[in-house]
């Protein structure tokens, strides 16, 4: 029987008590300055073409240079990518990713950002669901993608970028990877990005509106198969505008890209926000605590939005010193549960407070943030740190299982606002289940106090958040159960001092079968991204189930774990 949910706003929403928490510079209502992130980039290009748009390690790239790279990609793809088509981007944090975004959007295409850690086994679903016409790949990611593309069997225009592209000669020794000096022929079926520099740049550009889909960002589905949230250009611009205003970003700021560009945080809180605020973005190939500390110190980075594990890694680095991060003052964290002990530790070391934030892939990044300059309260009932208050134009309510609007009791958090995705790509069932009358059912359990502060106390969904990456248990279970020795498997998240949570698998073997933890982890590594591979595997006789046969994950989570 379907649940009936009232559309009447809860009391806290009616009074908008959280607006009273806003910084004086944040209005109660916001309108994006641009209709698309592409328009924001074009404005930066028109105003300051020879100003530095980004720093890749120590190597600068101006708006004009980034525009040239994007136009060459656009010209190469023009014959294969029509308006409404999809372009896959599977790469680490390099300027080529930004060039691919611009090129795809100028062609009127949607971008499919894919984690650089995906295996060919995982990629087959993404390709069959998104059906891209073209792809920009990092050199290290090309083998897995090309193998999956061959199995998929559709024609693709593939361009491969090297990690050393755009680096000054003096900068190359600092790179963290070995796959930077590839030369000679490109991987089979692909072309080097560097070879496109001989092409005549394209100049045409599609007309984009705020309701057009900008991104297909994949997140976990209830069946274990990832689903793609349809984030529109309007969604992206609104969220970027919020970050610009909430973080008080001005022309003197320099934004550090600490999140991957395959993740909604990297795409919105870093790339789009830098363009809307017209400020330079500092990036490295991938996150490394020592490299981040060097970049902050060298470039005078002032702000970032990062998983709490990024701050922990920098604190724990042997070269960490407060003077190195003295300019780093506008800090936010989200994507994984934030511990007050880590916030306190960073503040004790630097004098700077880390502000909490909360959002989903489906909400195009943050919907709740702690107002800049304020401290998040701790929920006396659960002990969790508040995720903040809803950002402008965002409605939030807490409902019971029967749809009853709750006061300060714990219930499911639902949201409505201009940053909410328009649904899931080619997935009517999950769209209908999660998006209802303009409200997004988050599956997260939380409460709101009388002052408008929100607290997340649990997840109604069983998603595991490891170092900011979401891991859906059923996907891991399906991978494990494909092993001939395994009868069934169940995966839960267990506490991890560094990652926040880490996957643990409970495995039931077929009678007479044998397997070891090492063997099964190796099996998973061939099929899953590294962060999804269960760190712990426990062999059990059976899995706990109720009378209807439903798996009781709570009992597994509550078991003692060492």
Predicted regions and their residues:
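AMP-binding/adenylate-forming catalytic core of the ANL superfamily
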Residues: 97, 118, 137, 417, ...
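Conserved beta-loop-beta connector loops within the AMP-binding
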Residues: 393-414, 450-451, 513-517, 552
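Conserved AMP-binding/adenylate-forming
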Residues: 59-60, 74-121, 130-133, 470, ...
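Conserved AMP-binding/adenylation subdomain of ANL enzymes
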Residues: 237-254, 262-303, 317
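Gly/Ser/Thr-rich phosphate-binding loop
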Residues: 298-306, 315-381, 395, 402
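Conserved pre-ATP/AMP-binding loop-to-beta segment of ANL
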Residues: 180-218, 225, 248-254, 407
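Conserved AMP-binding A3 loop
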Residues: 62-64, 205, 214-238
């Amino acid at each position: 029987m379907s649940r009936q949910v009232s559309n009447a706003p809860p009391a806290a929403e009616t009074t908008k008590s959280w607006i009273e928490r806003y910084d004086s510079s944040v209005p109660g209502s916001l309108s994006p300055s641009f209709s698309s992130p592409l328009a924001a980039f074009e404005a930066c290009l028109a105003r300051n073409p020879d100003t530095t748009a980004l720093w890749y390690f120590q190597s600068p790239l101006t708006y004009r240079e980034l525009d040239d790279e994007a136009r060459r990609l656009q010209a190469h793809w023009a014959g294969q990518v029509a308006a409404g088509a999809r372009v896959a981007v599977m790469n680490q944090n390099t300027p080529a990713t930004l060039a691919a975004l611009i090129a795809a959007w100028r062609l009127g295409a949607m971008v499919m950002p894919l984690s650089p850690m995906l295996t060919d086994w995982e990629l087959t679903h993404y390709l069959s669901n998104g059906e891209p016409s073209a792809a920009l790949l990092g050199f290290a990611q090309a083998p897995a993608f090309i193998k999956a593309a061959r199995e998929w069997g559709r024609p693709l225009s593939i361009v491969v970028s090297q990690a050393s592209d755009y680096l000054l000669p003096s900068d190359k020794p600092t790179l963290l990877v070995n796959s930077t000096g590839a030369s000679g022929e490109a991987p089979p079926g692909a072309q080097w990005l560097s070879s496109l520099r001989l092409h005549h740049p394209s100049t045409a550009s599609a007309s984009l509106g705020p309701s057009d889909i900008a991104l297909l960002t994949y997140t976990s589905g209830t069946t274990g198969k990832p689903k793609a949230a349809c984030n529109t250009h309007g969604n992206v611009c609104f969220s970027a505008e919020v970050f610009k205003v909430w973080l008080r970003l001005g022309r003197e700021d320099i934004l550090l890209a600490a999140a991957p560009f395959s993740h909604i945080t990297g795409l919105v809180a870093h790339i789009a926000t830098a363009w809307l605020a017209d400020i330079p973005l500092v990036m490295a190939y991938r996150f490394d605590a020592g490299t981040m500390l060097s970049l902050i110190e060298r470039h005078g980075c002032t702000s970032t939005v990062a998983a709490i594990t990024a701050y922990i890694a920098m604190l724990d680095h042997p070269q960490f010193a407060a003077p190195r991060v003295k300019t780093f003052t506008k800090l936010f964290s989200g994507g994984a549960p934030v511990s007050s002990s880590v916030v306190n530790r960073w503040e004790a070391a630097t004098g700077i407070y880390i502000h909490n934030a909360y959002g989903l892939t489906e909400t195009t990044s943050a919907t709740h943030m702690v107002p800049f300059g304020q401290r998040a309260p701790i929920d006396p009932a659960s002990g969790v740190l508040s995720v903040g208050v809803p950002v402008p134009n965002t409605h939030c309510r807490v409902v019971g299982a029967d749809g009853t609007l709750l006061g300060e009791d714990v219930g499911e958090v639902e949201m409505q606002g201009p940053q909410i995705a328009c649904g899931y790509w080619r997935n009517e069932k999950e769209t209908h289940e999660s998006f209802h009358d303009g409200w997004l059912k988050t599956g997260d359990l939380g409460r709101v106090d009388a002052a408008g502060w929100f607290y997340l106390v649990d997840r109604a969904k069983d998603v595991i958040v490891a170092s900011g990456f979401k891991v859906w248990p059923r996907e891991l279970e399906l991978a494990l159960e494909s092993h001939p020795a395994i009868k069934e498997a169940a995966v839960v998240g267990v506490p991890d001092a560094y990652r926040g949570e880490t996957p643990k698998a409970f495995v039931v073997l077929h009678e007479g079968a044998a397997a070891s933890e090492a063997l099964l982890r190796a099996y998973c590594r061939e099929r899953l991204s590294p962060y999804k591979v269960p760190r712990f595997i426990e062999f059990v006789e059976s899995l706990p189930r109720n009378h209807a046969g439903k798996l009781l994950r709570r009992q597994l989570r509550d078991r003692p774990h060492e």
